[in-house]
Design a protein with these regions (language model features):
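Bacterial N-terminal signal peptides that target proteins for export
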Residues: 1-8
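Bacterial N-terminal signal peptides
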Residues: 8-16
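Short linear Ser/Thr-Pro motifs
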Residues: 17, 49, 101-102
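Extracellular adhesion/carbohydrate-recognition regions
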Residues: 21-73, 109-113
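Short, solvent-exposed mixed-charge patches
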Residues: 141-142
């Protein structure tokens, strides 16, 4: 009986150790400095706020609101907004409205935005009021 117990214990240990080792060597995809209530954009080193700013804002106010959150916070680029739109179910709680982007359309002098019902990109005057979802980017260490 002792021999059987020893063999069984050895087999269970052999099965458990690789699993435990594999789990312990996996990297946490989150930056340890990432702010609370943020979600990492898959495949990018950018984190999305878990919620919209409390109201619709002009572009200037939206840009200031994100920057005032602290170092690393800003409006998302139009490319980042497109990626966020693709993963909107992962991030959750998006309105069916336009969201401001960081960049300006140099031809029109208006700022880009993206509609979260259909992914349509448009541009509008800075005084228009749209939804805002800030992003955080970790500081680069070169």
């Amino acid at each position: 009986m002792k021999k059987f117990s020893l063999v069984l214990l050895t087999l269970l240990t052999m099965l458990w150790i690789p699993t435990c080792f594999a789990q312990s060597t996996e990297e946490d995809p989150r930056d340890p400095n990432a702010p609370a209530n943020t979600i990492k954009i898959p495949g990018r080193d950018i984190y999305v706020s878990g919620m919209d700013e409390p109201s619709r804002m002009s572009w200037d106010v939206a840009n200031s609101a994100c920057n005032c959150r602290g170092k690393g916070w800003r409006l998302p680029t139009i490319g980042e907004l497109q990626t966020i739109y693709q993963y909107k179910d992962l991030f959750g709680n998006f309105s069916r409205e336009y969201y401001w982007a960081l960049e300006m359309n140099v031809r029109s002098g208006r700022y880009y935005n993206l509609k979260f019902t259909n992914g349509k990109i448009a541009d509008e005057e800075v005084k228009e009021r749209n939804k805002v979802r800030c992003v955080w980017v970790p500081a680069r260490v070169d």
